[in-house]
């Protein structure tokens, strides 16, 4: 049995497509309802006030407001702080 590889054969050349995970909206940023805040695998960040969690653990805004990161019982939590109604 020959132990030389055939010409131009290679064992390399495979890699999975990047999943584009991470924080998409940072602390203090204004967001609208439905905007994705964090894409993650597992719950590195937990949903807080006005934040929902999708089936793939994605966190998204339920209401418009400012993004706020906090810790609660040693968990990293993401909240949306609603903007105060401005009366003209």
Curated annotation (Swiss-Prot):
It comes from the Bacteria. The keyword tRNA processing does not apply. Gene3D superfamilies: 2.40.50.100. Residues 1-27 are annotated as: Disordered. SUPFAM superfamilies: Ribosomal L27 protein-like. GO terms for molecular function: structural constituent of ribosome. Keywords: Ribonucleoprotein, Ribosomal protein. GO terms for biological process: translation. InterPro entries: Ribosomal_bL27, Ribosomal_bL27_CS. This is Large ribosomal subunit protein bL27. It comes from Corynebacterium jeikeium (strain K411).
């Amino acid at each position: 049995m020959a132990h030389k590889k055939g010409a131009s054969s290679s064992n390399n050349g495979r890699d999975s497509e990047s999943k584009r995970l991470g924080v998409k909206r940072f602390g203090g940023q204004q967001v609208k309802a439905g905007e994705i805040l964090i894409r993650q695998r597992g719950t590195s960040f937990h949903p807080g006030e006005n934040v929902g969690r999708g089936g793939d653990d994605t966190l998204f805004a339920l209401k418009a407001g400012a993004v706020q990161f906090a810790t609660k019982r040693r968990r990293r939590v993401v909240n949306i702080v609603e903007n105060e109604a401005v009366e003209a």
